[in-house]
Design a protein with these regions (language model features):
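Inter-Walker segment of RecA-like/P-loop motor cores
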Residues: 67, 80-113
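Walker B catalytic acidic pair
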Residues: 120-122
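Conserved helicase/translocase motor-coupling segment
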Residues: 213-277
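Conserved Walker A/P-loop ATP-binding site and its immediately adjacent core
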Residues: 32-39, 47-82, 151-156
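Walker A/P-loop
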Residues: 19-38, 147
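Conserved pre-motif I regulatory segment
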Residues: 1-24
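Conserved P-loop NTPase motor "coupling/switch" region that bridges the ATPase
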Residues: 60-61, 116, 133-215
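Pre-Walker A (Motif I) flank of P-loop NTPase domains
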Residues: 18-23, 60, 142, 277
Length: 277
């Protein structure tokens, strides 16, 4: 049975993670598998061992709230499989419930209790329906957030700060940290933030960065091919599109025909196939 293997940067992040944290990493760093590994180890599993270590039975139900695209393309299913987990009860090796759904449906899970939630592609901004549902879920369950882009403004952190109990609500946060410019009474603008040191400490408490240095070497090789020079010159002379059998009316149309003549060359296609062999 396959063991669970994490890379060094993923292990470092795993050791720093805690309930209510934000796992931050670029695309390709492995946030998904690291987040499931956190759930897996919290439920008794172990990573980087000689063989698969079973979680306690039954482990907590697992809910993954992600984008509709990731749900529909089953991206998370591939990561779950390493841990013998599946949204299909007949495939899942455990008796717990595993759900992968989109942010649009987060309201369906506000009554769930004593489960574990992974919120992927963090969409918690403002005070709309998603944020309200998130607050209800966070009170009764364990949870973590995944993002490639941490908040641009301190206001973006309000939902996570409130859910972690740092502030009672948005009003308290605003009263303690936000100074508005009221020149336009209908649309006040944030002028500055107060007590930023506290905000930095709170952010450092919950933000887990996945530091991953890519050690790759770029390889460039020029491959020279031929094309139909006579057809190329004829298109420029006659301003006639041989593919659509109609006149070329502008410069962009001529450039399109020239590119197509070059790219459709049999010599070019053969060279491309040889690269993939």
């Amino acid at each position: 049975m396959a063991k669970i293997h994490l890379y060094d940067h993923q292990l470092e992040a795993l050791e720093k993670m805690s309930n209510g944290c934000i796992l931050c990493g670029d695309v390709g760093t492995g946030k998904s598998i690291t987040s499931i590994a956190y759930y897996y180890t919290k439920q008794g599993g172990k990573v980087n061992t000689d063989k698969y270590v079973w979680m306690k039975k039954p482990p907590k139900d697992l809910y993954i709230i992600t984008t509709a695209r990731k749900r529909d393309t089953f991206e998370w299913e591939g990561e779950l499989a390493w841990f013998l987990l599946s949204t299909d009860p007949e495939v899942n090796a455990y008796k717990n419930k595993v759900v992968v759904d989109s942010w649009n449906n987060i309201g369906k899970y506000v009554d769930v209790e004593n489960a574990f939630f992974i919120f992927d592609e963090q969409r918690l901004v403002g005070s709309g329906a998603w944020v309200k549902a998130f607050y209800k879920i966070a009170k009764k369950n364990e949870w973590i957030l995944l993002t490639a882009t941490p908040g641009d403004s301190w206001m973006d952190y309000i939902p996570v700060f409130v859910a972690n109990g740092f502030y009672k609500n948005k009003t308290q946060f605003v009263n303690e940290h936000v100074v508005y410019n009221w020149r336009n009474k209908n649309y006040p603008q944030i002028e500055r933030f107060m007590n930023v040191r506290r905000l930095i400490r709170l952010r450092e408490k919950i933000l887990v960065d996945m530091v991953f240095e890519r050690h790759t070497v770029r390889h460039v090789e020029d491959v020279y091919t031929t094309y139909d020079i006579s057809a190329y010159k004829e298109a420029g002379r006659s301003r006639w599109d041989p593919f659509k059998d109609e006149p070329i009316t502008n410069a962009s149309g001529l450039c399109y025909v020239w590119r197509k003549i070059v790219n459709s060359s049999e010599s070019r296609q053969t060279a491309l196939l040889e690269i993939f062999e």
